[in-house]
Amino acid sequence: MKYMKIVITVILSFLLCGCASAGAPAQIAATTLPVWEFTSRLCSGTPVTVTRLITEQVSCLHDYSLNVRQVKAAEAAETIVISGAGLEDFLDDLLANASIIDASEGIPLLCGEEQEEEHHHEEGHHHEEDPHIWLAPENAKIMSRNICDGLSARYPQYAQTFETNLSQLLNELTVLQQYGEDTLSQLKCRKLITFHDGFSYFADAFDLTIVKAVEEESGSEASARDLIELITLVEENALPAVFTETSGSSSAANIISRETGCGVCSLDMAMSGSSYFDAMYHNIDTIKEALG
């Protein structure tokens, strides 16, 4: 009898461990701020946990590499949500055998050649296709829908919650788009010089024109020729301000400001920080204040 009790206890222990393992919260990793925020919002009210891989203050991932902690978090995740459109190309080896939700599916991408033709972008270090899709709220809606569909396919027991959360998220993105249109509709100047080549989707979303996008390499500074060209553009277009990126250098912009009297303002790529929405509202308000 005592032997049977021991056997039953052991069997129950294994069963309980199995149940605990089966019922453990799903682990998801998301690469950057926008997809992490959208995924976290969609998973609210479920036991699904979402880890953000890239938390440092960054404005591009050209030369980025994950540290040991980030690699372990990615390997521990059942699913990895990526922004897509080539942004995470540096993760190809890590993602090769992973379950991926690509948030960029179905979004029309701006190509480098198109950017240079339409917005007169400087030739330089940019992706063949511009991956900064989240800077247009309408694209962010598509990203959110893609993530929701991917989550529902993997965790159908929470599909209704995902859909409910998606509805609220889409409403907030609609409000963001409308706020940007209303705030920027009567600008005295609609032309920008930016010290990052990733604001094309934002410009298109709010009917702005990027006269020049300068992508300064890490550790390098604009040449005298570049500065002369930029100063000329500021003067010819009567630009009241030029726009740096929060994580980038402002040295060239400050020189241009001294020579022309234009202001220097900072825009946010919304790749890091604490809130996609805060970054987007900051960009809208900053442009309104700078360009009137």
What are these regions (language model features)?
Residues M1-K2:
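N-terminal secretory signal peptides that target proteins for export/translocation
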Residues V7-C17:
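Bacterial N-terminal signal peptides
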Residues C19-G292:
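Extracytoplasmic metal-acquisition and chelation regions
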